[in-house]
């Protein structure tokens, strides 16, 4: 990392006294009170800068997070209003610190003025500028429609996948298919590679996710138009020689066995090589890749396999095989160069053509909002000043998931004067598939006016906090990337009920690492996951038994299943743990992406509703009673006689007398 890009030292943030100007980056590790501090910054900006609720821009990346921030900030304002009216902080450290600092004797704001500003903000809080990134961009563009160069009436779409694919199909038809018709070998290569309009669409989607990235085509040479003909000529020569000399080659190799390496060129391997060459020539494709087994009969492979002091078997075919391998590689490189040339042309023209089609059809996607605002800010410098006057201060939440385009927008509007606060934790970056880029976070930190960390973990116990500090600080490059560092945190002062486990035979410890039993064989990933799930379920079952006996508890309260969380890396692993827990008779709730309508509970509810809808249908009744909710076994269901069901002629609804 260059000296210019090296991040400055981070200071521990005291949110109630830090300067409210410039560009500030705050690294907020998990559990350190990120939202609490955002609320404090918001209140200080509102009071000390005399800003309205609609003037402080707060941006986060999901609608759920936006709603949470909205309610948390409103709640803080209401608490503060009550404290100013009554003179009582209610024991809340948030309010107490504000009364000591911003509203204290050393502060420049008297309580009466502060109360007016708080009440003004609460009255107008429905207009608070707390948005997702896309909602902010849309509002900004609506305030400057001519600069945005967007249609006044348009169809907002979540994405432009259908239009992208339409464009890709057109390019495939007009550019790729004519080239494939001219070069049959290229057509075969496209089929073998799985190329098609979908591949073009995927390339364009990646390009649109990072519109500021510079495309570099270094090392992409011009296609060698003679490569296919050279490969065909070499193939014909080799095939002809093989037809004439196969038996002689076989005999030669048998004779040469004593001088050949018996790991790579043992008799069975040479038999496979002979068969592979015969099959390859029978296929008749001059540019097809040589089978791996066939490569054992190239001169290069035979020289390598010859024992020290031995004489390498000699035959013209071995040299021709070497030449054919090189010719096939050259033909492959030519096809690849043709495809890359097409991709380069495609990515050069497609973004502009896609934008033109969208304008014609009055369609705008969410990603277009960002691109259009960025373009408008670059084209019209006055727009940045207009937006800065509209939003004199900004707080960006989850900044680690910001992509280069998003940061460029905020940087253009708010830097260098600010106040702009960028709050996030690079260790929790999860949206790389949406083009979020950790290097954006690191670059922003290098150029920030000030960098802070939140150093008090309010969520975990002191033992867990200490263990995490020792675990991650034992390696100065625990997160690999330069600049992605671990800052030690300390536990908060909140008193928690201690966890007591009187049934644990092992050494006490809040942070433990389990290892699967070792063995001589290879442990497959599938088997390792199954063993881990079983071990996890067994431990939970042990804790639940201890809870029933009063030995496993939180303070004086027996431990309950709801006190236990199992963290996994994938949804599939979560489903595995849930199934294994069920075999132990332990119920669990899985937080997954699947629709609630695809769950087992939904299927059972559907069966019950179907039985209610048709009370005379014995089959539906049996299906409903077989649900887990009723617990009837097969014997009980079979004993249900047709007479047990309601008569089929009963009306579905009984009229209510008027």
Region locations from a protein language model:
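Short, motif-level signal for alpha-helix interfacial/capping segments enriched in acidic residues
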Residues: 9, 108-115, 342-345, 373-381, ...
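Conserved helicase/translocase P-loop NTPase motor core
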Residues: 130-137, 164, 168, 343-392, ...
